[in-house]
Structure formats: C-alpha cells, structure tokens
Amino acid sequence: MLLKQTKIVATISDQRCDVDFIKQLFDAGLNVVRMNTAHAGREGFEKLIANVRTVSNRIAILMDTKGPEVRTTVLDEPIPFKAGDRVKVVGNPDRQTTRECISVSYPNFVHDLNVGGHILIDDGDLELVVVEKNADHLLCEVQNEATLSSRKSVNVPGVRINLPSLTEKDRNNILYAIEKDIDFIAHSFVRNRQDILDIKAILDAHNSDIRIIAKIENQEGVDNIDEILEVADGVMIARGDLGIEVPQERIPGIQRLLIRKCILAKKPVIVATQMLHTMISNPRPTRAEVTDIANAIYYRTDALMLSGETAYGKYPVEAVKTMTKVAAQAEKDKLADNDIRIPLDENSNDVTAFLAKQAVKATTKLKIRAIITDSYSGRTARNLAAFRGKYPVLAICYKEKTLRHLALSYGVEAIYMPELANGQEYYFAALRRLLQEGRLQPTDMVGYLSSGKAGTQTSFLEINVVEDALKHAEDSVLPNSNRYL
C-alpha cells in the first residue's frame, strides 16, 4: 500500500537528475517531479524528462511557467545598499542596473506605482519606499541593509501589475510541454480565470490533455479563487511570493481557506515553499517545520512541495524521507471532527459524487480496506480523493497518462492495466494483482465503483470480501467501455 496518502512534489534540477538519484527520491515517497523553467534549458529538460520516465511511469512531471513576473535587470557585480540610501527605479528591460538606478523588466512600472508604495526585491530582502514619482523614474528610499544581484524578483504589494498572463518564453515552454507529453503545467501568478483560459486555448489548439495548476501568489488570485477553480485543474499555494504580496501573518488563514475551496471543488491542492527549508543545509528539520507539514495535512491538503531542499540542497533524499514520515504520522493523528464536509448539490444529478461519498462513508461503518475504481479520465478517483477517506483509493487506469494525472490526488494509488473487454473482468484482474502483490488479503473487504453501461458515468457501488468476489468471477460480466469514470 501507499507509504502515505499525502502526495509529495519535489523540484529537481537538471544539474542533479541522474536515474539513481530520482530512484532514491521515488523510493522515499516522491510522486511528482517539478521542473522550474527559470533555471534550466532544453538540453537539461531532455535529460531530466528521460531519466524520470526511466525510473517509473507513475511519476508525474510538472512544469512551471514564469507568468507575469517582474525582475531587476542584470548588473556587473553585486551592489550593497544601506538604510536611508536613495536610488532611482525605472522600467526598462534593456537597461543595466547600477548603484544609482535599478532597472526592472516591466516598461510601465513607473506608471503603475505611486508615492508611498513599497517595492520588495529578491523575496523582500531589499525593501524600497517610493518618495517621489516622475514621468520617467521613481525616486525611492532604501529601508534596510541588503546586497542586490542580477535578475532578482520584484513585488509590489497591493498593486496590480498590468502584464500579459503569458510571456513569449511561456508560450514556447508550453509548446515544448505538449511535445514532450508533460502531465501538469503550473502557471505562476494566476490572477483570474482568463489567465488559465489563455493556456487552455494553446492546449486545446494542439489537442493536449495537460492539466493546469494555478499558482496563487498574490491578493488578486486569492480574491478570485472561485472563478479560477472553475477552469483550473488544481491549485498550488505558493507561499513564497504570496507572503510578500500580502502580510505574512495572513498566510496561514489564506492557506486554510484555499485548501477548503479546492476540496469543495474536488480539485487537488499543493502547499508549497519552505516546508523543510533548513534541510537545504542541515540533516534534520526544525520542530516548526515538522509542525508546518502536519498542519497542512490537518487542513487536508492533497500534496506538499519541496523546492531548494531537493533541487540543490545537501540532504534531498533525507528531506523526502522526513516529509513522508511526518505525513504518515499526521494522517494517523488528524481528527475526524475536522474533516471538511462536502455537501451534495440538491439540484445536481451527479451520481459519481453521490456514490463516491457513500463509498468513503462506508469505510467508517464497515471493515473496508480499500476502494477500487476503474478509470479512463480519473474523475471518479478525484471525487473519492476529495472525501479524504481513511483507506486508499486504488484507481485502475486504462491509460498511463491518467495514472500520472492522479499523482496529486490525496490517497489515490493509481495502477495501469491494459483495457479489457468489460469492467468486471477488469475488477477481478485488479483483485488478483493486488492479492499477488500483497496489497490486499483474501479476507479484506473492498468497495468497487464502476459503470454497468457503456459510455456512462459511474452508476454503482459494490462491496465485497475479496475471496468471495473472486469465487464468483466467472458468473459476473458487465460491459464497460467507459469514458467518463
């Protein structure tokens, strides 16, 4: 069975992505590999993708886009600043940054800011306050001692930056993701539904089934989460930039709100940034980091993400092992009283959602040790994941891509099996395989969700003891060429 039900996303650099390394992370609990387009080129991506697929067809690959970000331009050497220093800021991507003038990549930067506005550079390490606004530049006062290097992030809390959702580099990377059949695209700085639809238009034009994860990194994204969830396939709570764009004391509350919204929408949610930050350079986490992981699970997140810990840290395998152990314990310790109740829409005839809820509820009343579903699209498995059952969901997938699309969903263990003539044969073959692999015992009780009619949504829930079901295997034949499960 699963090491833990919470999924783990790990950022891997093309500088450290050999097969043995990825295999160690996978064995430690890795489910999804994240590729950061800001730090690698095509040659590096080629190597990383090939090595991930060599290790396992179950590891999903998630590619980040840059989105509408603002950065400082290049400079000759790091520049030290002290509190009280005055410096000009201009919006010119082609101008080099100097001690006297910081240039940023957004041409209309001066226009969008006003006197009194705060500019946070390099994740807030360098803070500026606008003291004077001119037609072609801002005059700012430095608030703290810091050293500025090339191409650092620029955030302006509370100010809407009117940049297009997709850069030309993003478009090229999306086309590359389509070519390589990547599983997820995580789009940065999503502000509204249109930001997601811009990517969907590209994917649809190429008949791609890549899933889109919306990275929520500013107040506008938080405010528009409902409309974003209508069109996105999942959400990443990117606490790094979010903690700069909004007051940091609000982050725990926003995290809890976004997780709840995603569960109600039955879409996976990832909590990211500094989960085990000290393990970049230390073999053990702080107690606060352990508690942070546990609290994200108590809030009911689907997945947790590691960034620098696995991309360039000294203890990448230990970080994944630590996260796996903490997650497994937190799943045991979480209180059922805090489960998020998902109401069923009285005006909806969504049989899949209804049966998924009953299947998970049955695990609390009967000795059911797993819920099995055969799935073409993964929809039924994602519905089951939303109800956060105690026991795993075993999703038998017709396509390997579906298997990887479920790599972010809580408690779902996806297994690939070639499509069979009918659903019951599929079910019995799955039971035999799970018995052979030691995942189930003959006396275990299992729930089975499927469809009795070709081309329809999930239509029945069946509960059996494994050995009893297999005794009657030859007597049960139900057609299932389902494309909706």
Regions inferred by a protein language model and the residue ranges of each:
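Non-catalytic helical/linker scaffolds that mediate oligomerization, partner binding
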Residues: M1-L485
